[in-house]
Swiss-Prot record:
Main location: cytoplasm
Entry protein name: Chaperone protein DnaJ
J domain residues: 5-70
Comment field on protein domains: The J domain is necessary and sufficient to stimulate DnaK ATPase activity. Zinc center 1 plays an important role in the autonomous, DnaK-independent chaperone activity of DnaJ. Zinc center 2 is essential for interaction with DnaK and for DnaJ activity.
GO biological process terms, semicolon-separated: chaperone cofactor-dependent protein refolding; DNA replication; protein refolding; response to heat
Function, as annotated: Participates actively in the response to hyperosmotic and heat shock by preventing the aggregation of stress-denatured proteins and by disaggregating proteins, also in an autonomous, DnaK-independent fashion. Unfolded proteins bind initially to DnaJ; upon interaction with the DnaJ-bound protein, DnaK hydrolyzes its bound ATP, resulting in the formation of a stable complex. GrpE releases ADP from DnaK; ATP binding to DnaK triggers the release of the substrate protein, thus completing the reaction cycle.
Oligomeric form and interacting partners: Homodimer.
Annotated family: Belongs to the DnaJ family.
Binding note for cofactor: Binds 2 Zn(2+) ions per monomer.
ZnF CR-type span: 134-212
Cysteines paired by S-S bonds: none
Pfam families the UniProt entry points to: DnaJ, DnaJ_C, DnaJ_CXXCXGXG
Source species of the chain: Neisseria gonorrhoeae (strain ATCC 700825 / FA 1090)
Binding annotation for Zn(2+) 1: 147, 150, 200, 203
């Protein structure tokens, strides 16, 4: 593993906040995760480097040591790492790199590693109708499941995990150096307190195997595009009996052919003939619940907005329901017949001098006269 600067490994500045470091780690860990890059040694090495960098920079004490001494703060073995503290390296086969981060930790609490299952994030696409009314969806997600051979224990059938002989089950070991009594995670069991002497052949002692799981997601009425649903305990299973992680489902709403959503309200264009626009009339308009009748007043102009109350989307958090807004578009007819042309020409002739019937046109002409007078 290279000794590249940990901040450079995560792509963050030295002054980066904890949240920035965590965000960068999650992005890179997802990118280089072995499950996403099978048989890719380069990605596997990158993943290890990212994990090592995050392990150091996410811990305040380790980060402080690294900022002061760099990689030398964590070099173990017989190389005399940590600059002038060469006498601390390699004693009794322990990695004293971790000890320095715990030198003044005190306490005798058990340093258990976090074996809880990973959180899993997936996306799902639904229709606007499903978002408005709510729907149940079944999705398949890649995950791990407890090994069916060892029942998740990690031990060979007939055997069982034994108390770690190094730490006697505490998960930590203590080292006495001069006046310092230092504590570190047990190098044998890695803090678990137990040691698997005969690992399961199928899972190789991990206690879980790759699988595909089907989960039913209850999507509530009123959900909006981009919102997430959390399913507790439906993420990756924990190791050696630890609790599972959570499943986060991000909902995406497919674009609708007619409606556009704005919060709880729906909007659509409603084309009408110029005859209906002038004379008024009644027509059917679509909603998410079927068709309803809408009365168009006479002398309706393009751009007029007509409301159909209660035909929007139900609120996710209250009993409120939005409205449907129909935006009128007066459509100019095309492909006219000779008879239609004659009637329109006749209409134009008999309309001459009746400027009050076209107030916008009259206003425009008046402005033109004022402009050039």
């Amino acid at each position: 593993m290279s000794n590249q600067d940990f901040y450079a490994t995560l792509g963050v500045a030295r002054a980066a906040t904890d949240d920035e470091i965590k965000k960068a780690y999650r992005k890179l860990a997802m990118k280089y995760h072995p499950d996403r890059n099978p048989d890719n040694k380069e990605a596997e090495e990158k993943f290890k480097e990212v994990q090592k960098a995050y392990e150091t920079l996410s811990d305040k004490e380790k980060r402080a040591m690294y900022d002061q001494y760099g990689h030398a703060a964590f070099e173990g073995g017989g190389q005399g790492g940590f600059g002038g503290f060469g006498g601390f390296g390699g004693a009794q086969g322990f990695d004293f790199g971790d000890i320095f981060s715990q030198m003044f930790g005190g306490g005798s609490g058990r340093a258990q590693p976090d074996y809880q299952g990973e959180d899993v994030q997936v996306g799902i696409e639904i229709t606007l109708e499903e978002a408005a009314k709510g729907v149940k969806k079944r999705i398949n997600i890649p995950t791990y499941e407890a090994c069916d051979v060892c029942n998740g224990s990690g031990a060979k059938p007939g055997a069982s995990p034994e108390t770690c002989p190094t730490c006697k089950g505490s998960g930590t070991v203590h080292i006495q150096q001069a006046i310092f009594r230092m504590q570190q995670t047990c190098p044998t069991c890695r803090g678990a307190g137990k040691h698997i002497k005969e690992p399961c052949v199928k899972c190789r002692g991990v206690g879980r195997n790759k699988a595909v799981k089907t989960v039913e997601v209850n999507i509530p009425a009123g959900i909006d595009d981009g919102q997430r649903i959390r399913l507790s305990g439906e993420g990756g299973p924990g190791m050696h009996g630890a609790p599972a992680g959570d499943l986060y489902v991000t909902v995406r709403i497919r674009a609708h052919k007619i409606f556009q959503r704005d919060g709880l309200d729906l909007h659509c264009e409603l084309p009408i003939s110029f005859a209906m626009a002038a004379l008024g009339g009644e027509l059917e308009v679509p909603t998410l619940d079927g068709k309803v009748k809408l009365t168009v007043p006479k002398e309706t102009q393009t751009g007029r907005r007509m409301r159909v109350k209660g035909k929007g989307v139900k609120s996710l958090r209250s009993s409120a329901t939005g409205d449907l807004y129909c935006h009128i578009v007066v459509e100019t007819p095309v492909n006219l017949t000779d008879r239609q042309k004659e009637l329109l020409e006749e209409f134009e002739r008999i309309s001459t001098g009746l400027e009050n019937q076209t107030p916008r046109k009259k206003s425009f002409l008046d402005k033109l006269r004022d402009l050039f007078d």
